[in-house]
């Protein structure tokens, strides 16, 4: 199966609505992201439903805890069979290393382990508010380097940082980019955004797209259009 670049961010508070949407799209066209709200509401059984339908799942729970607790949560995600799981890079090198090491017994079947750098809603004043006198881009660079040094597979970052991180950390270090809006879409609550084609050109490996697909009249067509637009730049 080809390496789908689009990850559709599911955002529903009713499982029936989520599955009704999922049944309109093809697992060959995208992967799916399940975040904190949906996982708290519906639990592992919902992830199993998505797996039954043939979808790869990015479990976006952003674990951040002491190394022992965080790594065990990552192992629980691996037991669920998810394709990707993430942890907050600000949890530090020991936490990330423990999380990576606990996945080693899974071999080729282990999920990708990704670090979260700076949330795309965060601006300089937000960082200042938590005691970080640093530009968001510099904090992203610092945390991304720490993530790579901890042996993780990549980071979540905004598309604006992608070319810089590819240059610094190499082409095999995966960049997962939220804040992607197809041309003509509403910006929503993301501060740092970019179109799918621009993001891939900038170095993003996977594109997280939510409402422009989930709220579309014909989500399958929107996905098809995005994938067609990406074909020349892959």
Curated annotation (Swiss-Prot):
Biological process GO terms, please? 'de novo' pyrimidine nucleobase biosynthetic process; 'de novo' UMP biosynthetic process
The record lists its disulfide bonds as none
UniProt binding sites for substrate: 11, 33, 60-69, 120, 181, 190, 210-211
**Family to which the UniProt record says this protein belongs:** Belongs to the OMP decarboxylase family. Type 1 subfamily.
Active site (record annotation): 62
* Keywords for the protein's UniProt record, in alphabetical order: Decarboxylase, Lyase, Pyrimidine biosynthesis
GO CC terms in record: cytosol
Question: Which PANTHER family does the record cross-reference, listed alphabetically?
Answer: OROTIDINE 5'-PHOSPHATE DECARBOXYLASE
The record describes the protein's role as: Catalyzes the decarboxylation of orotidine 5'-monophosphate (OMP) to uridine 5'-monophosphate (UMP).
Catalytic activity field = orotidine 5'-phosphate + H(+) = UMP + CO2
* Quaternary structure and interacting proteins, as annotated: Homodimer.
Q: Which GO terms describe its molecular function?
A: orotidine-5'-phosphate decarboxylase activity
Q: Describe which pathway this protein belongs to, using the record's wording.
A: Pyrimidine metabolism; UMP biosynthesis via de novo pathway; UMP from orotate: step 2/2
- Indicate yes or no for the key word Disulfide bond: no
How is this protein named in the record?
Answer: Orotidine 5'-phosphate decarboxylase
Annotated InterPro entries: Aldolase_TIM, OMPdecase, OMPdecase_AS, OMPdecase_bac, OMPdeCOase_dom, RibuloseP-bd_barrel
Record's Gene3D superfamilies? Aldolase class I (3.20.20.70)
Q: Which SUPFAM superfamilies match?
A: Ribulose-phoshate binding barrel
Q: What is its EC number?
A: 4.1.1.23
């Amino acid at each position: 199966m080809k390496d789908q670049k689009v990850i559709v961010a599911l955002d529903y508070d009713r499982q029936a609505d989520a599955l009704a949407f999922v049944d309109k799209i093809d697992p060959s066209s995208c992967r799916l992201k399940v975040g904190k709200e949906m996982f708290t509401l519906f639990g592992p059984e919902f992830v199993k439903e998505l797996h039954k339908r043939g979808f790869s799942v990015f479990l976006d729970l952003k674990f951040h805890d002491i190394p022992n607790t965080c790594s065990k949560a990552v192992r629980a995600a691996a037991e669920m069979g998810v394709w990707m799981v993430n942890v907050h890079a600000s949890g530090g090198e020991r936490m990330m290393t423990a999380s990576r090491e606990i996945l080693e017994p899974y071999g080729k079947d282990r999920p990708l382990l990704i670090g979260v750098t700076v949330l795309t809603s965060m601006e300089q004043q937000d960082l200042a508010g938590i005691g970080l006198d640093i530009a968001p881009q510099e904090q992203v660079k610092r945390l991304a380097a720490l993530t790579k040094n901890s042996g993780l597979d990549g980071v979540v970052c905004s598309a604006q940082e992608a070319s810089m991180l590819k240059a610094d950390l190499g082409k095999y270090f995966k960049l997962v980019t939220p804040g992607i809006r197809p041309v003509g879409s509403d910006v929503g609550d993301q501060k740092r955004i970019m179109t799918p084609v621009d993001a891939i050109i900038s170095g993003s490996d996977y594109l997280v797209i939510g409402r422009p697909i989930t709220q579309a009249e014909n989500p399958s067509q929107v996905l098809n259009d995005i994938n067609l637009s990406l074909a020349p730049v892959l």
